[in-house]
Amino acid sequence: DGLLSALEKIRDKIRYRHGRAYDKFRKKYDGVVEGFLKDLISSIKSYPLGEDIKEDLIEQYEGYLERKELPDSLADAYPGRLKRKLKEAKEETKALEEEYEDQFDEAMQDYLDLLTKTANSVLKKGEVAKGKMFILENKVTTDNKDRFEKIMDKEKVPLPKEA
């Protein structure tokens, strides 16, 4: 699709400009999350629990691992060591997010500006569909950090849709 490939060219420019900082942040952040969850899963495997319960818990935390998310909390039955480790992991990921926040906002603003600039340029050439799509992409991404994060993660983010 011509519109999506035109949009991907802009996304690639932004990834090229800001990708190193994002990848560095992502690697550290994901490392903290994965480290905690792998420790938690291996601890669960060694607990004297019924196999069904173990399997359910492991499956639950493997879901977190896949999404690269920390759980909000652990049940009271978990040892203090793991609760402390979760607290430390949360503090560390929060610090990493705060440390990277300005760079993320700058990358996102750069993307939004490039969309506007490109929209104006293609509209002057009479490419109305492309111009409107770039303007719409700017509009749907403006307050949507999750969408921009997916773009930076090189996920397939579809063409924008009217809200």
State where each predicted segment sits.
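Low-complexity, Gly/Pro
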Residues: 1-163
